[in-house]
Regions:
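Alpha-helical transmembrane segments of multi-pass membrane transporters
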Residues: 124-147, 161-166
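Interfacial/gating helices of multi-pass transporter permease domains
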Residues: 1-17, 48, 148-153, 187
Length: 187
């Protein structure tokens, strides 16, 4: 109901307000990758990609730790959440945090796809993401469980699927971006 909508908006909002970071990180990572792609130096490109992956893993870890410390405190002590929905609010926070972490670690793979101008892949994954979110919204109508928690679980799963699609595509199709590095010539 109305309370659940408000809880989701506030709790997930604590995490998603940092979503602007993903756009900025993706744009800058894409620029570095595209620049090195233009140099046609596969070693430099691989180093740049590996560095981007490592930086984003570190950012994800630090964000996770900070959110666990500050976010949980805010939910349990600062926000005015009905007592009977506090457990659900904590679960929503955890699933929203998972969604956020997947978003961060997806950035280098998304940026590599864009840097290589594989817009068909980007569009396909975006369509899959949108369709899965539509299915998630429909499943809420039939859910015999706490819909607030179920929705946040579905969004976390969709975020994981989106990450996996980018990860698998990059690892299989963009040979210069394989982790660990392998010796390949530029396409």
């Amino acid at each position: 109901g109305i309370d659940d909508y408000g809880i989701y908006g506030v709790v997930a909002g604590l995490i998603t307000m940092f979503g602007f970071m993903n756009a900025a990180m993706s744009s800058s990572t894409q620029r570095y990758l595209a620049f090195n792609l233009g140099l046609k130096d596969s070693i430099k490109l691989q180093q740049t990609f590996t560095t981007a992956v490592n930086i984003h893993l570190l950012i994800a870890l630090l964000s996770f730790l900070l959110a666990e410390a500050v976010g949980l405190w805010a939910i349990n002590h600062l926000l005015d959440i009905p007592t009977d929905r506090l457990v659900a609010a904590n679960k929503v926070f955890q699933y929203s945090l998972i969604t956020f972490v997947f978003g961060i670690i997806q950035v280098p793979y998304h940026a590599a796809t864009i840097a290589y101008e594989r817009m068909n892949v980007y569009a396909s994954i975006s369509i899959v993401d949108a369709v899965l979110k539509l299915i998630a919204a429909y499943l809420l109508l039939m859910a015999p469980v706490d819909r607030l928690v179920f929705y946040s679980q579905l969004l976390a799963a969709i975020s994981g699927i989106s990450f996996l699609l980018y990860f698998v595509y990059v690892q299989l199709q963009l040979k210069e971006m394989v982790i660990p590095p392998q010796n390949h010539s530029m396409n």
